[in-house]
Amino acid sequence: MKKEDGEGNIRMKFKGRDFLTLMDYTNEEIDFILNTATDFKNKLAKREPHEQLRGRTLAMLFEKPSTRTRTSFQAAIAHLGAQSFYMTPQQTQLSRGEPIKDTARVIDRYCDGLVIRTFEQEKVEEYAKYMESPVVNALTDLTHPCQGLADMLTIKEKKGSLKGKKIAYAGDVWNVCHSLIIASSIMGMNIYVARPKGYDPNEKIMKFAEEKAEKSGAEIVITTDLHSAVKDADVVYANTWHSMGGPEKEKEKRIRDFKPYQINANILSEAKKDAIFMHCLPGYRGEEMTDEVIEGPQSAVWDQAENRMHTEKAVLALIIP
C-alpha cells in the first residue's frame, strides 16, 4: 500500500467526528493529528496558504472567560479560510431557558461545527447528541483535550518523541491534569502527579488510564512526594492551584495545601538537565511557579501556548466535512 493511500485511509476516519475527549481517539489517530498540526505550523511559517475550510462557518459558544482558547481558535479558523461566530449564553436564548437540544439543532442548521467551552462535560455531550455537525470540546471541568494536544506537540518538538518520556505534574488535579493523564496512558508517556493528600483525579479518568497504560507501557503515578515526581523528569509541568470553575471558596485553603508543591529553581534542578518547564496558563507567579522558572531558559510555555493554535487547526481541518 502506498504511503498516501494509508494516509488517506486514516484521514477519512476523522470526517464528521466530534472531538469531546482524547479518550475517543487512538494512539495512531492522535499521532496523525500531531503530524497534521506540524504540517500546518510549517505552512504558516512559510506563509503558505492553507484555506482548507473556505466557505465553512463555525459557531463558538463560550460560557467561561478565555484568552488562549478563544484567540487560538479564531486565528486557526481564519487561517483555514472559514468564518467564526463568537457567542456567550447571555447573548442567546439559552439565557431565557431555551433547552440545549433546541439551541444545538438550530446552530446545526447554520454552521458546519461548534466549538464549546463550558462547565459540565455532559453539556458538550448533549450538544453532540443533537447536532449532525462536529462538536469540539474547548474545555470542560472534566477534560481539556485541546490543551492535551498542544502539550503533546510541544513535548514531541522539544524531546523528539513521546513514548517513555517522564512528565512531573504539580498543580490542581483538574481538567488539564486529566487530559495529561489520558494522553500519557494512550501514548506511553510516564506521568507523575504530585499533589497534597485528598486531591485525587477523577475515578473514571483513572480507570481508563490504567487500562490503557497496560497496553502502552505508560506509568501513571499519583503521589504526595514532589521530589520523587520531579526526579529525572523530562518535563516539569506546573498548573494553578485554584482552577477556573473550581471551588473558589476553597482558594485560600488550596494555596496553603499546595504551597509545598511550587516549582522553583531548586525543584527544577532535580529534573534532567535538559528538562523543559511547561504551564498551560494563566499562571500565578509566586504561587505554583516562580518568575525565575517561567522566564528561564528551560521554559517552553510560549511555544506551548502557540501550539494550541496549530493543534486546534489540525482538529478542525480533519473533522469538519
What spans do the regions from the language model cover?
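Rossmann-like adenosine-cofactor binding region
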Residues: 210-292
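Short, structured coil segments at secondary-structure junctions
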Residues: 80, 110, 130-131, 187, ...
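Anion-binding alpha/beta catalytic cores of soluble intermediary-metabolism enzymes, centered on
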Residues: 2, 105-107, 112-183, 279
